[in-house]
């Protein structure tokens, strides 16, 4: 009588951790394989280099400091983000604060220019 795959799985499931570890070692010796995962270090490094060489297309506009003219900054933040008065005020008080995410470079520069004109400090990342 042949043993079914389900019976093998049942048996393996009933083994203790120590017995299972010994079974793995036996498989490694008998079949000349290793249970440790192989890591391809070169692929990870190459992927990082490719990402750095590509020009970034999505930028985040971050309000680093609202400066002395807070009311003017709040008005510009409302204009840019469409936030209500309270939300815009909170955004200018809790700096650094991400105002816009995933915008193109041109739009990010325009937003930065508007905010800097009213005395805010802005970062683009």
Swiss-Prot record:
GO terms for molecular function: mRNA binding; structural constituent of ribosome. GO terms for cellular component: cytosolic large ribosomal subunit. HAMAP family: Ribosomal_bL12 (MF_00368). Belongs to the bacterial ribosomal protein bL12 family. Forms part of the ribosomal stalk which helps the ribosome interact with GTP-bound translation factors. Is thus essential for accurate translation. This is Large ribosomal subunit protein bL12. Homodimer. Part of the ribosomal stalk of the 50S ribosomal subunit. Forms a multimeric L10(L12)X complex, where L10 forms an elongated spine to which 2 to 4 L12 dimers bind in a sequential fashion. Binds GTP-bound translation factors. GO terms for biological process: translation. Keywords: Ribonucleoprotein, Ribosomal protein. NCBIfam families: L12. InterPro entries: Ribosomal_bL12, Ribosomal_bL12_C, Ribosomal_bL12_C/ClpS-like, Ribosomal_bL12_oligo, Ribosomal_bL12_oligo_N_sf. Pfam families: Ribosomal_L12 (PF00542), Ribosomal_L12_N (PF16320).
């Amino acid at each position: 009588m042949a043993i079914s795959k389900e019976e093998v799985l049942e048996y393996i499931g009933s083994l203790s951790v120590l017995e299972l570890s010994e079974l793995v070692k036996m498989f490694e010796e008998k079949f000349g394989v290793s249970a440790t995962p192989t890591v391809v270090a070169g692929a990870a490094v190459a992927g990082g280099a490719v990402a750095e060489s590509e020009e970034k297309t999505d930028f985040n506009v971050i309000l680093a400091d609202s400066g002395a003219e807070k009311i003017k900054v709040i008005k510009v933040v409302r204009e840019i983000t469409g936030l209500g008065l309270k939300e815009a005020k909170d955004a200018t008080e809790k700096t650094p604060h991400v105002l816009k995410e995933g915008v193109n470079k041109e739009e990010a520069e325009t937003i930065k220019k508007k905010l800097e004109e009213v005395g805010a400090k802005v970062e683009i990342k």
